[in-house]
Amino acid sequence: MKKLIIALVAMFSMTFTTASAMSYEQARQQALFLTDKMAYELNLTDDQYEAAYEINLDYLMGVDTYDDLYGVYWRQRNLDLSYILLDWQYRNFCAASYFYRPLYWDAGYFHFGIYARYPRRDYFF
């Protein structure tokens, strides 16, 4: 009986702390929207845009759980972006929380902070 209760508690705690990974199509759309806004605000070149898109896509594809939000993939993403952005671009990137921390967790789901700044999800520059 004790083992059953422990197993049930473990199962419920895992259910509330995990989320399903994004599909490739959803990650691609989110990375494209995020990178488009980065290009607009940070004045990215074409080469920077392509590299930032790939970096953002890799990060979004790597996020599966709450722990992944600001884990290894997030640190690698920001490190990679520091290599492709100029100093002033990277400072502005870090100052904008919707770029620096593109995902946040609320009520058991991932949310994209960029939509607080740009609510029209179908508008690209």
Per-region residue spans from a language model:
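Low-complexity segments
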Residues: 25, 29-36, 40, 46-125
